C-alpha cells in the first residue's frame, strides 16, 4: 500500500507538461488512447441511431392493385379481420397492415401481399 501512496504522491507533483508526456508514454506502452471517455460516449451515442439497423417495420399497403379480391383475402388471412374490414382497408389504401413487425415478418407479409397483386412498402 505504501508503494501506491508513493505513486500517487509522485503523480501529484508532476507539472502539466510532464503529465502529458507520461500520458503519451503510457499510450505507446499499453497500445491505448487516452481520449476522454465522455466525449467518445457522446459522439458514439449520437452516431449510434444512424448506424443501427432498423429492427421494427410498418407494413404499408400502398395500393390494392388490379386483383383486389386476392389482396382482400390475403389481408384477411394476415390480420384476422372480417371481410368488410379487410375490404375497407384495401380500398382505403394507403393503410398500415402491420406495425412494429420484425424485419423477417415484415418481408414475409410484403411478399405475400405482392404475390396477391398489391403494392406494399416497408417503413
Swiss-Prot record:
One GO biological process term: translation
Source species taxonomy: Bacteria, Pseudomonadati, Pseudomonadota, Alphaproteobacteria, Hyphomicrobiales
GO CC annotation: cytoplasm; ribonucleoprotein complex; ribosome
Annotated keywords: Ribonucleoprotein, Ribosomal protein
An example Gene Ontology molecular-function term: structural constituent of ribosome
Native source species: Bartonella tribocorum (strain CIP 105476 / IBS 506)
Record-linked HAMAP family: Ribosomal_bL12
Subunit (UniProt): Homodimer. Part of the ribosomal stalk of the 50S ribosomal subunit. Forms a multimeric L10(L12)X complex, where L10 forms an elongated spine to which 2 to 4 L12 dimers bind in a sequential fashion. Binds GTP-bound translation factors.
Role according to the record: Forms part of the ribosomal stalk which helps the ribosome interact with GTP-bound translation factors. Is thus essential for accurate translation.
Gene3D superfamilies named in the record: 3.30.1390.10, Single helix bin (1.20.5.710)
Keyword Cell inner membrane: no
CDD domains named in the record: Ribosomal_L7_L12
Family: Belongs to the bacterial ribosomal protein bL12 family.
Name used for this protein in its record: Large ribosomal subunit protein bL12
